[in-house]
């Protein structure tokens, strides 16, 4: 029974965190489930928001070709999300053409501020490559707005009993979104 319980717990951790953490971080959580704290906690995080600049021009380029617009946005989000995961970030959510990510939760990351900045720089570098690729396809260049803030915020599972997300909130999050 203990084996089944542990297996189910590991599967739950993979289901909950597998889509927005690197496989190595998910494995750490599976081996050490006590690192997860249900509810919320105050913690210093580095929070990043990015958004596409020039989205109106890009969407006008596609006109009524919603599949084309969806495909190019998915390519962009995939490339940028990879940088978050590679640098030990937690992808919080997509908000239209924006992304929200944070560092130092659910696992401790003593280098969270540096990792967030490294991610931003890597994203900007990859954006250049991405724009070179899509230029060959006749697609207008993507611009990127990027804000990073480090502050003590509340992080944890938040929402309703029917649906919740692992996210963060507080003044520090709001500031990052406005940078």
Model regions: which residues?
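Catalytic NTP-binding/metal-coordinating core of nucleotidyl cyclase/transferase enzymes
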Residues: 36-118, 166
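Catalytic core of nucleotidyl cyclases, primarily class III adenylyl/guanylyl cyclases
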Residues: 83-115, 129-173
